[in-house]
Amino acid sequence: MTKLLELKNISHSNKESIRVKGINLTINQGEKIALIGKSGSGKSTLISIANGSLIPNEGDVIWKGSHINNISNIESSKIGTIWQDLSLIEELNVAQNINCGALGKHNFIWALKNLLGVLDKGLCQECLAAVSLPKETIYSYINKLSGGQKKRIAIARLLRQEPEIVLGDEPFSNLDPVLSKNILNLLINQKNYLRIKIPETILISLHQINLINNFNRVIGLKDGEIVIDGEIKNINQSELDWLF
């Protein structure tokens, strides 16, 4: 299997507490990984370190053989992340926000055209359809949308980015169970009816334990350490009960 992302001997702490410790993790191309653990177990910290936005006190993050601090902007754009804090731009409309997902692959002129609203909106509409929003939504402004709609826009922006891997920090919070499962099915089952390429590899933290059966690998964190790592078929209910 092709290694995409490696976390080697990762430990990180702040003044209040140890966040993660002794993390060794390899994510291979095509893996669908659920990251689980109770609140405060270190899931958000691990995601932040994995995408390079948080530098750990100890250890290294390797992306396709290169240290994550040394990769180009184009390579960085191949690592897609969706946060609980969605980071949408309130002053822009939905189409402009979705196209922001592709900024890493284009030049300044393309970015300017996006701000002017003159780019083709077809791909944006396809991304909206993937998250069950009507195509007319592209003309709406972010500050007019509900929390659940904003979450779907953030996921649509991630799809527009066309990353090789998706890192998600509880991306399905604020979404109803049916929609959560539909979007997860899009990522897991690779239904490429879109012109955009659906990412093959995902690492997503979850609080909806009922969704983990959709993944082929489960990682459990407890007090900042990996205590479960294996195929879902090999993890029993008593292990999950102990984890939480």
What positions do the PLM features span?
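Hydrophobic anchor residue at the start of the ABC signature
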Residues: 154-155
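Conserved ABC ATPase "signature" region
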Residues: 112-136
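Helix N-cap at the start of a conserved alpha-helix in ABC-type nucleotide-binding domains
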Residues: 177-179
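Catalytic Walker B motif of ABC-type/P-loop ATPase nucleotide-binding domains
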Residues: 166-169
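ABC ATPase NBD coupling module
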Residues: 67-83, 117
